[in-house]
Amino acid sequence: MASMSFALNRFSGLSSKTTLSADFDPSSRRSFLPPTRVGLKISSAAESEPDLSVTVNGLKMPNPFVIGSGPPGTNYTVMKRAFDEGWGAVIAKTVSLDASKVINVTPRYARLRTGSNGSAKTDVIGWQNIELISDRPLETMLKEFERLKKEYPDRILIASVMEEYNKTAWEELIDRVEQTGVDALEINFSCPHGMPERRMGAAVGQDCALLDEVCGWINAKATVPVWAKMTPNITDITEPARVSLKSGCEGIAAINTIMSVMGIDMKTLRPEPCVEGYSTPGGYSYKAVRPIALAKVMNIAKMMKSEFSEDRSLSGIGGVETGYDAAEFILLGSNTVQVCTGVMMHGYGHVKTLCAELKDFMKQHNFSTIEEFRGHSLQYFTTHTDLVKRQKEAVEQRKAEKRGLKSDKDWTGDGFVKETESMVSN
């Protein structure tokens, strides 16, 4: 990708390590609450197609749909397929320095279906995995990153990285990954299972003191944009998000999977997924988690809007299956929307459906660009106390209107008799 480096301080709204594409337009910088333009569009023969392109932390993508870190980004072949099908960006499966310590088991997935336990033919609404990070040698993954960037120089490739609580190890991993030409880093502070004893993944993301220290190491070394991926398995997700941003991260990605036990087999009485008769809690994803993910994203977006400059980004994750699902995340402030389990369910070509549905939504509401509606729905969230107050005022207003006209200008010719009657007291 043809690019130029900007060395601007935080007051300019861009990090010193942000690399911008040559056609980056500073006027496209994000705003959480764009002007309200909601309303049905009147079709025109000359109407133009909505523009799905986004520029995030200086990285230009053809659309906001990003392959989330996981099985869909395990190797060169599948990541190439994602680019060929039209995904806006690809986040590779998480890598670490020593893949020999990563040992996966089979089976490692389990499904939740609608209906009673044991239903075999109903719709899948939830997905659990006990899969670890990449078990492929780091050298192999790095060669494939480099190959992808040579073949697709204008497409965005993001490396997901995770390492033990060791400054030297983190610095080595970041240095080696960046040498391949990847466009950004996503730091996995959120994997809910596997290797917690090595202080990896959620073991760091749930400890703000550790998180602050590790983010400091990473951001002192990194020269490309850094996104911190949040765990939902915490009381207040805005706390680690705030720490990550204060420590220098350009963006937040949320959420990773939710710690869960998928269920018990009613015949064997063993938990699922069952490996040699045993199991372990794993990460829960797909459609059923979307309401939880939306709430987490909403809270992070509101925090970011009130406390940080507009150059920081937010990548929404959790249960996205349709373009309309994606629109919900964007309406709550997300710059990009990640899809992982959805790709495992529908394949890489599903991005075409996602783009078509998102464009359909935009046409319905007369939106030309993503920025025109990003963050629009944040303004409608308030406290329960305020809801009570608003409803009380609305009820009083309706009662007042029933009691009669408020002003001479409110009289109408057609309803004159009824309007007169409405103001009679006996």
UniProtKB/Swiss-Prot annotation:
Superkingdom field: Eukaryota
Gene: PYD1
Induction: Up-regulated by nitrogen limitation.
Disruption phenotype: No visible phenotype, but impaired degradation of both thymine and uracil. Slower germination and 2 days delay in seedling development.
GO molecular function, one term: dihydropyrimidine dehydrogenase (NADP+) activity
Active site: C191
Chain positions with N-acetylalanine modification: A45
EC number: 1.3.1.2
Protein name: Dihydropyrimidine dehydrogenase (NADP(+)), chloroplastic
Alphabetical GO biological process terms: beta-alanine biosynthetic process; cellular response to nitrogen levels; uracil catabolic process
Catalytic reaction(s) noted: 5,6-dihydrouracil + NADP(+) = uracil + NADPH + H(+)
High-level lineage: Eukaryota, Viridiplantae, Streptophyta, Embryophyta, Tracheophyta
Locations listed in the record: Plastid, Chloroplast
Pathway assignment: Amino-acid biosynthesis; beta-alanine biosynthesis
Region spans: Disordered: 395-414
Transit peptide, from-to: 1-44
Keywords: Acetylation, Chloroplast, NADP, Oxidoreductase, Plastid, Transit peptide
GO CC field: chloroplast; chloroplast stroma; plastid
Disulphide linkage map: none
Pfam families linked to this entry: DHO_dh
Enzyme class: oxidoreductase
Binding annotation for substrate: N129, N188, F189, S190, N256, T257
